[in-house]
Amino acid sequence: MSSWDEFCGQRRGALERFVNGDAGPYKQLWSHGDDVTIFGGWGGYEQGWDAVSWRLDWAASRFGEGHVGIGNLGAGSSGDLAYSIDIERNVGLVDGASRGETALRVTHICQRAGGGWRIVHRHADRLGPREDPAS
């Protein structure tokens, strides 16, 4: 059975492949059930494995020559559920054009199944500047 730390390492490697146009390794880490969801970094959401799988293929196809750095803000597991809260910083090509760094706030929710951990939800959105509540 894959430990949570091993799974997080696999996810890091899979995301590196993802930002180079290959969704396959990341998709292998997902549950393939009707209850999986993704709130994608380009907006919108998908529910159910067929829709999530399509979205992951579409998103990965937009990337190339990329690198992702992951800064973990927190993670934990209890029983058959686990989560991670990260800042993902990506550089590379999007739609064939070079871009600067993009930072995303990302939460993964995972469930233990089939002898290891599987992603059941990803929420990603752009990390914007912090607004001062006093102003």
Q: Residue locations for each model-derived region?
A:
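A beta-strand edge to alpha-helix "cap/lid" segment located at domain peripheries
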Residues: 1-28, 35-135
